[in-house]
Swiss-Prot record:
Taxonomic lineage: Bacteria, Bacillati, Bacillota, Bacilli, Lactobacillales
Region Small ATPAse domain (RuvB-S): start-end pairs: 185-255
Name recorded for this polypeptide: Holliday junction branch migration complex subunit RuvB
Region feature (Head domain (RuvB-H)): 258-335
Subcellular location: Cytoplasm
Residue span of region Large ATPase domain (RuvB-L): 2-184
Gene source species: Latilactobacillus sakei subsp. sakei (strain 23K) (Lactobacillus sakei subsp. sakei)
């Protein structure tokens, strides 16, 4: 169910990934939002270039869809070096990592998405690579097995994760630069929607961009997806410009409400109110009622409801807040 949501921040679609590439900024000056992160990185990058050194290893963490991969590519562009991209699940064996590291030239960037999913053996091999730019691997088996020392050129590892808490302390401590990617403001999302509309050769007025931005859950990936779907409705209606009215119509048809909630989000809140008086309700109970795995509720649905204050966690379980009741047009019960 989660994979089919138009407001999902995950990106598992090849066509969508290809479109995202066309929308990506190339330098920090083009990157919209995340001002604190950008300002800090600009200093670190400029200092590294002046010292003619590789940039310290960078860890980017935060919810999906906020531009961690894009920012990694921007960093490489700013450093004027090549970037090699991979993901934690794709590096199954130490040999896979060795092959990647051997391709690097001095100063290059190695980007590992979902770095929290690296196998333990691969992660341990990274320690010396990150700290001292060498790796030792064992070649051969049995009595003929012997370690081989591989020196590496200085490089920058950029790791991205949606679950920083799953990183081991030894790996986390080897990142000299750690940056948290926050949800975007409506103003930043408006700018992103207007920029993307320009890339798509679409006409959009500010109130149309705002209507899409306010329903995008603070996430650029969702904003761009909603923009594309709104474009479809506008074209079918023979409307050349996306304004507030067509955006509202399109997104209402897609069941994305003014706070970015879809039918599943509202179902969770409504179920908790109707069956459990708003909570507290345990995670397993919510998952069973919705027909999803515990992890899906916790990682896909819950974060945004917590972020906007419609849910809260307690020691006894999840509870719908007064704001959550108000959004559904229901009175908050006196308890």
């Amino acid at each position: 169910m989660a994979d089919e949501r138009i407001v999902s921040a995950e990106n598992d679609d090849f066509a969508e990934a290809s479109i995202e590439k066309t929308l990506r900024p190339q330098v920090l000056a083009q990157y919209i939002g995340q001002d604190r992160v950008k300002n800090e990185l600009a200093v670190y990058i400029e200092a590294a270039k002046k010292r003619e050194e590789s940039l310290d290893h960078v860890l980017l963490y935060g919810p999906p869809g906020l531009g961690k991969t894009t920012l990694a590519m921007v960093i490489a562009n700013e450093l004027q070096v090549q970037i090699r991209t991979t993901s934690g699940p794709a590096i199954e064996r130490p040999g896979d990592l060795v092959a990647l590291l051997n391709e690097l030239q001095p100063g290059d960037v190695l980007f590992i998405d979902e770095i929290h999913r690296l196998p333990k053996m691969v992660e341990e091999l990274l320690y010396s690579a990150m700290e001292d730019f060498y790796i030792d691997i064992v070649v051969g088996q049995g009595p003929t097995a012997h370690p081989v020392h591989f020196p590496l050129p200085p490089f920058t590892l950029i790791g991205a994760t949606t679950r920083a808490g799953l990183l081991s302390a030894p790996l986390r401590d080897r990142f000299g630069i750690v940056e948290h990617m926050a949800y975007y403001t409506e103003a930043d999302l408006m700018d992103i929607v207007q920029r993307s509309a320009g890339v798509f050769n679409m006409s959009i007025v500010p109130d149309g961009a705002l209507e899409i931005a306010r329903r995008s859950r603070g996430t650029p990936r969702i904003a761009n997806r909603l923009l594309k779907r709104t474009r479809d409705y506008a074209q079918v209606a023979d409307q050349n410009t996306i304004d507030q009215a067509i955006a509202d119509h399109a997104l209402s048809q897609l069941q994305v409400d003014i706070r970015g909630l879809d039918g599943v989000d509202r179902k969770i809140l409504q179920m908790m109110i109707d069956y459990y008086q708003g909570g507290p309700v345990g995670l397993k109970t919510i998952a069973a009622n919705i027909g999803e795995e515990n992890e899906t509720i916790e990682e896909v649905y819950e974060p945004y409801l917590l972020q906007i204050g419609f849910l809260k966690r307690t020691q006894r379980g999840r509870m719908v807040t007064p704001a959550g009741y108000a959004h559904l047009g229901m009175p908050y019960p006196e308890k």
